[in-house]
Amino acid sequence: MKKYKNILLGCTLVLFFVFATTFTWLYSQINSALPMLDGKADIFGLSGTTVIERDGNGIATIKGEQRNDVAVALGFVHAQERFFQMDLLRRNSAGELSSLFGPAALKHDKKIRRHRFRERAREIIKHLPPQQLALLKAYTRGVNQGLELLKAAPFEYLLLQQEPVFWQEEDTVLTIFSMYIDLQFEYGERELTLGMIKNTLGDDMYQFLNPKGSRWDAAIDNSRYPQSPIPVQGWQANSAASHSGKTQASPSHYQDLALPGSNNWAVSGKLSENGSAILANDMHLNLRVPNTWYRASLEYRNHENQAVKVTGVSLPGAPSIIAGSNGDIAWGFTNSYGDWSDVILLETNEDNSQYLTPDGYLPFTTYKQVIAVKDQQSVEISVRDTIWGPVIGENYQGQMIAYRWVAHDLNAVNLNLTELEQAKNTDQAFAIAATSGIPAQNMVVADKAGNIGWTIMGPIPVKLGDIGDVPASWATGENSWSGYLSPDLYPKIKNPESNRLWTANSRVVGGEMLDKIGNGGYALGARASQIRDNLREKSRFNEQDLLDIALDHRAKFLERWQDFLLTKVLTPTALAKHDQWQQVKTLLDNKELKATTDSVAYRLVRNFRLNVKNQLFKGVNNQLATVDNGNTYDTYVIRHQLEIPLWQLITKQPLAYLPPSTSSWQDLFEQALAKTVEDMTADQALEDATWGQQNTAQIRHPLSRAVPFIGYLLDMPATELAGDKYMPHVQNNTFGASERMVVAPGFEHQGILHMPTSQSGHPWSPYYGKGHDDWVKGKVSPFLPGETEYTLTLSNY
């Protein structure tokens, strides 16, 4: 017996030793991947000493002799803090995730390879102006030396059992291509869906589901467009069969998924306390660890030997300050949702080897693509191109389609945005915007002299023929793109009479300017109208006033739904049938609806609306899914304009649209409310079913789902969040303001800037997670970096 005890003890000691050794090695490796914060480092490619200072939150101030030196240092800190994030961005657009993650990413890689983004990135690099190429080379040198000077590879590679691959100049272009993928439709989903709606349901229904305007419109030029009338015939799909199947009521359904967007607004110097214009900007993106942006302040001397200081947010993978202030101007962006692409119906010969063009039938150009797959053999695929763009598949009728997209052209990407760092006024910013290569954005700019302006930053195609919302053939030559809009013709507005500007992903202008921009799927104007109304309520502003607008979570959009519930649904008859509904009425009565974490009323109204929408549009969604033979095209891609026909239907209540599972419109509303209450009270009392309980942060690292227990170290706290989608304070579980910035150029010391997660991508960093709570609570946190706590000096060798 004693012998077995000794063996057991020996085995235990061996196991403990192995565990301790493994843990010590693992700890050492992860600890070695921490960035250099203090001391000195010798770096190749600097013209002089460059200093990287960090404050207690890790916010970097980079001081160099010239812009290229600062680019080296910015690349250095990006690599040391965020290389894995940069790697994912380049691999995402290049279709190279499989080499990192294995077969799980192969479907994505095969699909995205149709765009051949790495080949396009290489071509763009060849055509960059010498000064921009030099800047990009400097940044790349910094990235690779920053990666090399880590004592161990970033911890993610240890977990994946991979080695990081050095950065190339083309990878910065791929990073920007990933932003194109995030901000625009890479497969023409919206046009394909609208084309299917028009062909399947008819033109009247197409106009009804895709209205040009509504009461929510808040264009800065006060332009208005009418909503479309309700077609008489009703849903063609309104049969019991089309409504069969499970009605969605999952948590994801109740998220009512948002679209990448943003808010920005500005007031001129005539309305500010110091004479400078003031800008506010919060860019809405999917939230993850680490955050999309990296905060930085860059100081250098330009070619005229003038001092430049620019502060804001940078994108790891690129050498520019994306949004910020330079003392003379401040600028920020919202996604424009203009029409930057077109789906082309190809007319092919019998064996699909050729397609018809204005010059007759031409053969497809075929490209071989080899996809490396972790721990497996490489996969080889072929992709086809046309004179207009890549073949991206077939439409619902089986017709081959190609895609014409700004992202495929040489002017899709350049580094002109970097010139904003030295712009002196709004007019100079306008000129830079009109030549910049980024996914087209609404740029709002404010300058120290008090001027404000709006324009589009990014390429604007000039379109000929009848193209736009739905797929069309280009075979005859009547439909085409004729280059890009010249800078002098760009839409812009400067110093409007109101001294106020605002954009929020909805339609910004009408008339000729709208004709140039087009409609690529505008958001409903609910956010924009609430921002506009807030701006109109005051005649004087400071930075706090603009932050208050960013944090406004009053549910103005849902007020009419609250009233509808109280007056049309919670009738005496309905209250008599449902005992619990008196409590619902009490919760809703005489309350200003706000998306606060403790609000039960907000959650009730919001989820009731979604259940009504889901039930009402279920038949047409199912019909489109059936016609499309199980593919993913449905009204999801036009969901943000569906509020307009939805409200028309519930107020007019035409019988032709009543779902067969309901006996009357009142029955539909009562079913929707019953489902709402049932879901909210599944495991708790109604009074405990708060909005914060549903809207709890799930801001995670990409690896936390795949590696057991690591989320405990990497993910942000599961905090209840105020705010929602159809209000300025956009904040959901995994989506929201990736930064909030308020700044008056020349008065940056009074500015405000905070963002989720933190500067660091390493969980053992001394500032990991610092600043996140400011973002959650909307605290005033300084725009400029704080006192220096860490200093790293880079010297040339």
What are these regions (language model features)?
Residues 1-17:
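N-terminal Sec-pathway targeting helices
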Residues 10, 22-278, 283, 289, ...:
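Substrate-recognition/specificity elements adjacent to catalytic centers across diverse enzyme folds
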Residues 64, 69-101, 332-380, 479-527, ...:
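Gly/Pro-rich active-site capping loops and adjacent beta-alpha segments
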Residues 70-73, 111, 120-133, 402-404, ...:
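Second-shell loop/turn segments in exported
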Residues 298-320, 324-329, 333-478:
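Glycine- and hydrophobic-rich flexible loops that cap the catalytic core of alpha/beta enzyme folds
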Residues 436-538, 604, 608-616, 625-626, ...:
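Hydrophobic alpha-helical segments
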Residues 516-517, 521-577, 665-797:
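Terminal end segments
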Residues 605-690:
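Charged, long alpha-helical assembly modules
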